[in-house]
Amino acid sequence: MANPTGGDSKNTLYCSFCGKSQHEVRKLIAGPTVFICDECVELCMDIIREETKSSALKSGDGVPTPREICNVLDDYVIGQEHAKRVLSVAVHNHYKRLNHSSKTDIELAKSNILLIGPTGCGKTLLAQTLARILDVPFTMADATTLTEAGYVGEDVENIILKLLQASEYNVERAQRGIVYIDEVDKITRKSDNPSITRDVSGEGVQQALLKIMEGTVASVPPQGGRKHPQQEFLQVDTTNILFICGGAFAGLDRIIAQRNKGTAMGFGAAVKEDDDKGVGELFKQLEPEDLLKFGLIPEFVGRLPVIATLGDLDEQALITILTQPKNALVKQYQRLFDLESVKLTFTEDALTAIAKRAIKRKTGARGLRSIMEDILLDTMFDLPGMDSVEEVVVNEEAVDNPTAKPLLIHTDSKKETASAG
């Protein structure tokens, strides 16, 4: 399509890939009998960059080094440097162990991972990114839906079934996959006395997870066991499946603070020495005994030898999340306003105020969208019916003052007005 018919084709040059003329693009690069425009070059660069990220540079034995894994995590996850390092080393060692398992008579044990951190701090995103880097089957399970076998709810074998589905029923690939079990703090023991009643969704689930996490040959029904009892079972060895468990563990910080205090304390009593410490700081002092007090059984804690704690995202990290990633929230809303032919601008003070509100709400990065919707709701309601609006400016007052609205800049007068309430 370097020279389409029609128009002034003799004098006009066209991109051989997208067909745009030299007048529609900024640059047109010429080669022997072909041309490529700057937009196609940028597209090619994006494709190459994505390919490079998804198949991170390999070390000599085909396993990405911890630094390479950490560098790719940096592209997707903001902050949480300590957790990234812990995860990078654990995952590198796990897949190195698989590649060298038959080369020596020393058997290397598997190191499953426990991620502990407040809501919205990036636990799930870290696990998803790891699977993308390593190009292995990945599945995510919700621990709150699991029950012991024989009770209403999902069996733990359903987790392995989801992993099989992610690997298109390739058993060999599934046996090298990653399973992320979310909300694992919700399956804690419901009572200190386990004999009072049957705990089918708490301690019972922990007991059921023990064998598949440690390594066993699980019989997995390909169509789900309860609806098709007559089907053939697939045998899946879970020995080399990496299990990552994550949870917010609300209240665990108080257990750690009480242990640090070193004395018995009444219910709800404040720990003055730890008042200025954030949740993330207290999580760094975590000991296995704290998890036992929280309600995890000793056998379950023992099968999660690698513990990575994540802290609350600070103000600067939240501002970065708002503006930097490819699909950052600010860019998403700017695109929405672009569809109305209106420019959307956030002042630096406004971004700082949004981050401060998210910190107060204690919802982490997840709370940012809710705050943005709150600020822009009335403007997005009125804007489609308004003429001559060229730009919407969100300043600090529009964020902090519930009655204040973003400023509207009109084309004709260039006069700033408050958005109609």
Curated annotation (Swiss-Prot):
One GO location term (cellular component): HslUV protease complex
PROSITE patterns linked: CLPX_ZB
Gene Ontology terms describing biological process: cell division; proteolysis involved in protein catabolic process
Binding site for Zn(2+): 15, 18, 37, 40
SS bonds (residue pairs): none
GO molecular function: ATP binding; ATP hydrolysis activity; ATP-dependent protein folding chaperone; protein dimerization activity; unfolded protein binding; zinc ion binding
InterPro entries, per the entry: AAA+_ATPase (IPR003593), ATP-dep_Clp_protease_ClpX (IPR050052), ATPase_AAA_core (IPR003959), Clp_ATPase_C (IPR019489), Clp_protease_ATP-bd_su_ClpX (IPR004487), ClpX_bact (IPR046425), P-loop_NTPase (IPR027417), Znf_CppX_C4 (IPR010603)
Binding site for ATP: 118-125
Domain of life the protein comes from: Bacteria
Ranges for domain ClpX-type ZB: 3-56
Keywords: ATP-binding, Chaperone, Metal-binding, Nucleotide-binding, Zinc
Pfam families reported for this sequence: AAA_2, ClpB_D2-small, zf-C4_ClpX
Membrane-spanning ranges: none
Task performed by this protein: ATP-dependent specificity component of the Clp protease. It directs the protease to specific substrates. Can perform chaperone functions in the absence of ClpP.
Listed PANTHER family: ATP-DEPENDENT CLP PROTEASE ATP-BINDING SUBUNIT CLPX-LIKE, MITOCHONDRIAL, ATP-DEPENDENT CLP PROTEASE ATP-BINDING SUBUNIT CLPX-LIKE, MITOCHONDRIAL-RELATED
Quaternary context: Component of the ClpX-ClpP complex. Forms a hexameric ring that, in the presence of ATP, binds to fourteen ClpP subunits assembled into a disk-like structure with a central cavity, resembling the structure of eukaryotic proteasomes.
Record family assignment: Belongs to the ClpX chaperone family.
This protein's name: ATP-dependent Clp protease ATP-binding subunit ClpX
